[in-house]
């Protein structure tokens, strides 16, 4: 079972990815993790990627496709894999198809932007322990204070509203077109495309996912 998970940052992809991995025994392939592992292992592609990253440049699509092909040939991908954070753009999706990497299921978790802003900008973190709160969904007992230590809570830079909106804008510009792209691929019978309402409870989304991935 080869799966691509699409959705904006903060849509709840990570939680559902965890569910899919546990349920179906397939690994999650994140391009970031994959790059770090290849660099650490010192593979030819890893060394090439390191050179590019050390120069502060973006790793090319060709290089990433090479790494994906290398990674999915490993034993733990025998039953399939879950691609996370890739492809991000239509040229990457085209390159995957050109390299014979077929996908069984494309899953989109859809959450309106305003809901994502509310979710993410409401997060508060206790820097010392990593405990996470939310001003609406999981508030601390005392506003702005950690339940255990009473110390101040902080907002991660990634969760600040301006940053969240910027990341959403990039998602809509680069990745959202993939929704249409895979819709056409599915219409041609080459993959299955399903969209889920990510504003539902985690359990409800997981249940619907399971019924589609049977």
Swiss-Prot record:
Catalysed reaction equations from the record: AMP + ATP = 2 ADP
One Pfam assignment: ADK_lid
Domain of life assignment: Bacteria
Role this protein plays: Catalyzes the reversible transfer of the terminal phosphate group between ATP and AMP. Plays an important role in cellular energy homeostasis and in adenine nucleotide metabolism.
Residues noted as binding ATP in the record, renumbered to the chain: 10-15, 123, 132-133, 200
Sequence segments annotated as region (NMP): 30-59
InterPro entries: Adenyl_kin_sub, Adenylat/UMP-CMP_kin, Adenylat_kinase_CS, Adenylate_kinase_lid-dom, P-loop_NTPase
Protein name from the UniProt record: Adenylate kinase
Nucleotide-binding found in the keyword field: yes
Binding site for AMP: 31, 36, 57-59, 85-88, 92, 156, 167
Keywords carried by this UniProt record: ATP-binding, Cytoplasm, Kinase, Nucleotide biosynthesis, Nucleotide-binding, Transferase
PANTHER family for this protein: NUCLEOTIDE KINASE (PTHR23359)
Entry's free-text remark on domains: Consists of three domains, a large central CORE domain and two small peripheral domains, NMPbind and LID, which undergo movements during catalysis. The LID domain closes over the site of phosphoryl transfer upon ATP binding. Assembling and dissambling the active center during each catalytic cycle provides an effective means to prevent ATP hydrolysis.
Enzyme Commission code(s) on record: 2.7.4.3
């Amino acid at each position: 079972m080869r799966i691509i998970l699409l959705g904006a940052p903060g849509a709840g992809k990570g939680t559902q990815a965890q569910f899919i991995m546990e349920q179906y025994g397939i690994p999650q392939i994140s391009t970031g993790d994959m790059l770090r592992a290849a660099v650490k292992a010192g593979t030819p592609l890893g060394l090439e990627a390191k050179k590019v990253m050390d120069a502060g440049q973006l790793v090319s699509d060709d290089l990433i496709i090479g790494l994906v092909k290398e990674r999915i040939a490993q034993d733990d991908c025998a039953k399939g894999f879950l691609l996370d954070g890739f492809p991000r753009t239509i040229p990457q999706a085209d390159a995957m198809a050109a390299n014979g990497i077929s996908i069984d299921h494309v899953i989109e978790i859809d959450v309106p932007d305003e809901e994502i802003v509310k979710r993410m900008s409401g997060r508060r973190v206790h820097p010392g322990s990593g405990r996470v709160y939310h001003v609406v969904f999981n508030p601390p007992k005392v506003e702005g204070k950690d339940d255990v230590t009473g110390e101040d809570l902080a907002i991660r830079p990634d969760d600040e509203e301006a940053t969240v909106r910027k990341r959403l804008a990039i998602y809509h510009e680069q990745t959202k077109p993939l929704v249409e792209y895979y819709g056409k691929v599915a219409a041609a019978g080459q993959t299955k495309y399903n969209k889920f309402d990510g504003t539902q409870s985690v359990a409800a989304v997981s249940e619907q996912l399971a019924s589609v991935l049977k």
